[in-house]
């Protein structure tokens, strides 16, 4: 019975130390998941990139994110912010930026902003992809004849027919 109590006490202490949300950059990450898994919730970071980040930060990737010490979280934050220094150029998501020519790895809101800026630039210069974006059509050569139809189907609405028949029957009476 006493071993059960010590296990319960240890579990309660872990719950007290657990941070349910860990903030990295502008993103709140789940503190109840493993470090590697939680990092993949951030835009611009996948499984492979998360593994590299944990290796660079010297943190156990299977550890619960919310139970890490402040210095470990700071090392992960530094690894995310300086990720382009630790990965090869072909692995970054901003290779040879159009304006600056730099190779960089963007994450979170910065990545969304850059993508939106790129799409707007394509629309402004009326490139083929920009025109497709303007029209709301598929951009990467997918078929459009039969797939991707967002409009509702033009079929028979049985309920509407029944309602019209009921209204017509009431009018006749």
Swiss-Prot record:
Compositionally skewed regions (Basic residues) per UniProt: 130-143
GO molecular function, one term: rRNA binding
Region (Disordered): 130-155
Transmembrane portions of the chain: none
InterPro entries, sorted: Rbsml_uS13_C, Ribosomal_uS13, Ribosomal_uS13-like_H2TH, Ribosomal_uS13_archaeal, Ribosomal_uS13_CS
Swiss-Prot/TrEMBL keywords: Ribonucleoprotein, Ribosomal protein, RNA-binding, rRNA-binding
GO biological process assignments: translation
Pfam families, A to Z: Ribosomal_S13
Matching Gene3D superfamilies: 1.10.8.50, 30s ribosomal protein s13, domain 2
SUPFAM superfamilies per UniProt: S13-like H2TH domain
One annotated Gene Ontology cellular component of this protein: small ribosomal subunit
Matches recorded under NCBIfam families: PRK04053.1 (NF003140), uS13_arch (TIGR03629)
Function comment: Located at the top of the head of the 30S subunit, it contacts several helices of the 16S rRNA. In the 70S ribosome it contacts the 23S rRNA (bridge B1a) and protein L5 of the 50S subunit (bridge B1b), connecting the 2 subunits; these bridges are implicated in subunit movement.
Family: Belongs to the universal ribosomal protein uS13 family.
Subunit comment: Part of the 30S ribosomal subunit. Forms a loose heterodimer with protein S19. Forms two bridges to the 50S subunit in the 70S ribosome.
HAMAP family: Ribosomal_uS13 (MF_01315)
Official protein name in the record: Small ribosomal subunit protein uS13
Organism field: Haloquadratum walsbyi (strain DSM 16790 / HBSQ001)
Organism ancestry: Archaea, Methanobacteriati, Methanobacteriota, Stenosarchaea group, Halobacteria
Protein's gene: rps13
């Amino acid at each position: 019975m006493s071993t059960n109590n010590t296990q319960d006490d240890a579990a309660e202490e872990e719950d007290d130390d657990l941070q349910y949300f860990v903030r990295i950059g502008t993103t709140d990450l789940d503190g109840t998941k493993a470090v590697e898994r939680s990092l993949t919730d951030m835009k611009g970071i996948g499984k492979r990139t998360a593994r590299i980040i944990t290796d660079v930060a010297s943190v156990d990737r299977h550890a619960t994110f919310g139970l890490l010490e402040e210095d470990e979280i700071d090392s992960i934050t530094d690894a995310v912010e300086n990720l382009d220094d630790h990965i090869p150029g072909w692995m970054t998501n901003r290779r040879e930026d159009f304006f600056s020519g730099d190779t960089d790895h963007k994450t979170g809101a910065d990545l969304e902003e850059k993508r939106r800026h790129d799409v707007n630039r394509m629309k402004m210069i009326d490139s083929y992809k920009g025109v497709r974006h303007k029209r709301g059509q598929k951009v990467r050569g997918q078929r459009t004849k039969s797939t991707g139809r967002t409009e509702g189907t033009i079929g028979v609405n049985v309920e509407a027919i029944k309602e019209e028949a009921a209204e017509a029957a009431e009018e006749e009476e």
